[in-house]
Regions:
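Sec/Tat signal peptide C-region and signal peptidase I cleavage site
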Residues: 17-21
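Envelope-exposed proteins and targeting segments
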Residues: 25-27, 34, 57-59, 97-99, ...
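Periplasmic peptidoglycan-binding/anchoring modules of Gram-negative envelope and division proteins
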Residues: 31-64, 92, 129-131
Length: 133
């Protein structure tokens, strides 16, 4: 079941989803280079996520972690996972039930801004959060 959930999250992040699912515009938070810690701006955005969650009561919150291409692929994948987990922990602390949150990590495989290998691109060090209805 968890694998199926991860696959659904991955497909949603690619813009592919079941016809019954309705997806709102994603929230996007950025991270400093080499850091999984949430910035003040990220925390403010996650508070918006929490408020929207309470208003709209989506079935699920999908969190997708990403990284830039400034390090080895394995390190970047781990960094994207830590960033996604940081966002999840914050949302849980704000009262969103853990069982309504799914996390996926994509490392450097889905850049927001295409770059060459080794490039530090702030927009690629991100977490995207979507509601699934």
């Amino acid at each position: 079941m968890r694998l199926l959930h991860t696959i659904i999250v991955a497909l949603a992040c690619l813009g592919i989803q079941p016809a019954a699912a309705q997806e709102a515009q994603p929230f996007r938070i950025l991270f400093d280079w080499g850091k999984p810690e949430l910035t003040r701006d990220a925390e403010a955005t996650l508070r918006e996520v929490t408020a929207d969650f309470r208003r709209s009561q989506p079935a699920q919150v999908d969190i997708a972690g990403h990284s830039d291409r400034s390090g080895p692929a394995g390190v970047n994948l781990a960094a994207s996972r830590r960033r996604a987990e940081a966002a999840k922990s914050f949302l849980i602390a704000q009262g969103i039930p853990a069982d309504r949150i799914a996390v996926a990590a994509f490392g450097e495989s889905r850049p927001f801004v295409p770059t060459e290998d080794g490039v530090r691109e702030a927009q690629n060090r991100r977490v995207e959060i979507r509601f699934m209805r």
